[in-house]
Curated annotation (Swiss-Prot):
Transmembrane segments: 3-23, 54-74, 81-101, 119-139, 149-169
UniProt superkingdom: Bacteria
Record bears the keyword Lipid metabolism: no
Family listed: Belongs to the YciB family.
Protein name: Inner membrane-spanning protein YciB
Keywords tagged on the record: Cell inner membrane, Cell membrane, Membrane, Transmembrane, Transmembrane helix
Gene it is expressed from: yciB
Database matches in InterPro entries: YciB (IPR006008)
Amino acid sequence: MKLLFDFFPIVLFFIVYKFFGIYTATAVAMVASLTQVAFYRLKFQHYEKMHLFSLAIIMVLGGATLFFQNPWFIKWKPTGIYWLSALVFYGSGYIGSKPLIQKMMEANINLTTKIWYRLNLAWTLFFIVMGALNLYVAYHYDTDVWVNFKLFGGVGFTLLFVLIQAFYLTKHTDEKSFEKQ
């Protein structure tokens, strides 16, 4: 259910784009992101950092898209999120006591420090590649293709990466690792 909630602004953007175009879809995505952050805050009494991060980027780039009537700003949004995520994941390996992926997953799985750092690097590289791929699609194909890629390609590649990661993790865990759950 949380996954659907997290993708709420993207799905609305996709649907509205199909009927009304890029500018209306951008405005709706901005409102949807703001609504998402407010709803989450009311329901859970705190903010989800990723929602705030995404909201800030969509407000800046979406606002620029609407103000300048130029869709290139919104097309850069996924790349901005991917590359800033890559920077945060990479930096977490050097700042703090643990890589970010370990902080996110260690309650559910027990891995060696070496594997945590490899996994963190894998996510860093994944985000860099996804950001570059978004730009490639944005600059080499029309907006219809980019919008489809933004939803289906982004989600599809992320699910594929998580599946590959799961197979990798099975080689480096034992059944006791999952007893924490």
